């Protein structure tokens, strides 16, 4: 036995390294098999449902260990292969902590996104769990220095390892069939992906790689079936053309997209301090339309997905980013294009660099006339929200009227840092992350108040519609209250002031409903593209859905919209 371990230490050690790394990859979202079995009380979990997915993990580890069968002298090749995978796991774990899903492989090529904000975020997320994946590799390298070259393996061993891996995947496939029942084909779990982390846990990491490669190289074409499904959905959409909720005068349209704003921060006092008093004052003003129960519908593109939803009324992809994969040479119907028909000029202003999330190319696809990033106002460092908002006032004043200004904040992006001048908000009985987030939004609120004052002093505010919308959620209400999360904790916000309507929408809706609502308020209902949502002024919303199947309400058309949007984007429907 001892001699067998010595002869096979590289193969065995490599296999163990990948088992641990794969376990750490699965743990953040769904909970790894070994993690659950070691940390949970027996009887508190379904043993079979927990154990069977482990066969898929072992199959993955066997496939990933295959290089160890062909290496003898150059063991560093195997060590480098393991280290590379461990680095991948560490990055994915940090991504999962924020986005609750695995990062698509295409995002690893987005070097333009690497900036100070991203590096600070990564530093705040890196913890002991990310280091655990590397520990078996360190032990393997240390032990390997004292042992002779590993044995040479023949074809039979290679075939045996591959056979064991296939057996593990077969167990996983059988489990999927029994779990899903007769309503799904045996291939459905492998050809349809709602969440990447779920695909990895259910089907395996190696099948996930195969799926990602196949979908990346398969050309996207709009089939006749795609067109029928799209047009069937659109035929059932409301087709109103009146502008009953718009001012007869053409007002400037100013949209402030607030980074990571959860609606629970509005109309809330913590430790005697009103978190966002300036924005709160808008909620209770005549001419304000407010919806504070918007289900966040962003996915892998996060902020860029939010911008895409708000400007087009389309939903993002359930895997991948529209901004990085489907913005080049595209022309989407949008707010900017709807307003341009009525003589509006437009610009998009952001705090970071144009290359981050491919923002400039997305802005072109959305029809903006001008795009300003941090290089327009500085040497290339990210702008503060305060500096961006002040620059925006000058740009609005200098633009031909009417103007559509799309302004994107950044400083409330996590990780939240200790404030230079803390208020009583820092004394909240909650994790530091929550306290620092409250302080960050309190500061941003003051900057938004200053922005509105500057518009007022220059005679611009009284002739403008100002919309404040969330790009997505981040610090959910359960984190403040110290309890298990619910969907209600994630709600985002839309506040539009300067309109001829006063209305508060108290029922849940989706981010996809922002676009048709803004069309309604801006008097652009002659524009043929109304989006996949519904104007919140036309009827009380009944439902909202997320791509993982989460449904609020009973209208399943909101789930269907995800499939329709995917077909529109991937098939380049608007190029017809």
Residue ranges and their predicted role:
Residues 228-576:
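Solvent-exposed soluble domains appended to multi-pass membrane proteins
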Residues 68, 89, 211, 313, ...:
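Short, hydrophobic/amphipathic alpha-helical patches that form generic packing surfaces
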Residues 172-250:
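Membrane-interface segments at or immediately adjacent to transmembrane helices
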Residues 7, 73, 121-124, 215, ...:
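Membrane-interface junctions
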Residues 99-111, 120-128, 195, 207, ...:
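General structural signal for secondary-structure boundaries
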Residues 2-208:
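Transmembrane and membrane-interface helices of multi-pass
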């Amino acid at each position: 036995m001892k001699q067998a371990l010595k002869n096979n230490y590289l193969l065995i050690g490599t296999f163990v390294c990948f088992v641990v790394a794969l376990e750490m990859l699965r743990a953040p979202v769904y909970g790894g098999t070994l993690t659950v079995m070691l940390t949970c009380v027996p009887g508190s979990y379904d043993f079979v449902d927990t154990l069977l997915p482990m066969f898929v993990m072992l199959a993955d580890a066997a496939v990933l260990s295959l290089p160890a069968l062909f290496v003898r002298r150059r063991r560093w090749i195997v060590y480098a292969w393991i280290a590379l995978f461990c680095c991948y796991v560490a990055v994915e774990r940090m991504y999962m902590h924020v986005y609750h899903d695995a990062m698509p492989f295409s995002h690893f090529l987005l070097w333009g996104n690497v900036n100070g904000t991203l590096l600070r975020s990564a530093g705040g997320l890196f913890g002991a769990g990310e280091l655990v994946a590397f520990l078996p590799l360190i032990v393997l390298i240390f032990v390997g220095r004292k042992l002779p070259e590993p044995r040479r393996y023949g074809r039979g061993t290679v075939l045996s390892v591959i056979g064991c891996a296939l057996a593990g995947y077969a167990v996983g496939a059988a489990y999927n069939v029994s779990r899903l029942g007769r309503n799904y084909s045996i291939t459905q779990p492998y050809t349809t992906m709602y969440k990447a982390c779920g695909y990895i846990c259910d089907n395996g990491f190696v099948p996930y790689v195969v799926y990602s490669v196949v979908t990346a190289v398969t050309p996207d074409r709009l089939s006749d079936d795609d067109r029928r499904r799209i047009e069937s959905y659109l035929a059932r959409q409301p087709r109103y053309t009146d502008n009953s909720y718009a001012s007869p005068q053409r007002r400037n349209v100013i949209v402030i997209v607030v980074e990571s704003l959860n609606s629970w921060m509005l109309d809330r006092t913590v430790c005697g301090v009103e978190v966002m008093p300036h924005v709160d004052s808008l909620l209770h003003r005549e001419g304000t339309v407010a919806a504070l129960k918007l289900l966040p519908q962003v996915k892998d593109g996060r902020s860029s997905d939010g911008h895409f939803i708000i400007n087009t009324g389309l939903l993002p992809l359930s895997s991948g980013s529209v901004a990085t994969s489907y913005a080049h040479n595209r022309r989407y119907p949008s707010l900017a294009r709807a307003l341009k028909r009525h003589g509006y000029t437009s610009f998009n202003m952001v705090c970071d660099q144009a290359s981050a999330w491919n923002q400039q190319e997305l802005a072109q696809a959305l029809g903006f006339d001008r795009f300003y990033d941090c290089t327009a106002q500085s040497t290339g460092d990210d702008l503060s929200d305060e500096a961006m908002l002040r620059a925006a006032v000058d740009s609005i004043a200098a633009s031909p009227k009417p103007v559509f200004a799309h302004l994107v904040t950044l400083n409330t992006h996590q990780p939240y840092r200790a404030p230079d001048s803390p208020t009583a908000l820092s004394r909240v009985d909650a994790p530091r992350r929550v306290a620092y987030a409250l302080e960050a939004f309190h500061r941003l609120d003051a900057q938004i108040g200053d922005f509105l004052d500057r518009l007022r002093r220059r005679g611009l505010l009284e002739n403008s519609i100002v919309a404040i919308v969330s790009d997505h959620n981040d610090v959910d209400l359960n984190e403040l209250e110290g309890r298990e999360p619910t969907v209600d904790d994630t709600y985002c916000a839309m506040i539009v002031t300067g309109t001829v309507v006063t209305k508060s929408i108290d029922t849940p809706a989706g981010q996809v409903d922002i676009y048709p609502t803004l069309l309604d308020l801006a008097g652009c209902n002659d524009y043929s593209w109304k989006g996949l949502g519904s104007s919140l002024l036309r009827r009380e919303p009944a439902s909202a859905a997320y791509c993982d199947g989460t449904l609020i309400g009973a209208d399943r058309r909101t789930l269907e919209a995800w499939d329709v949007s995917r077909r529109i984007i991937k098939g380049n429907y608007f190029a017809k």
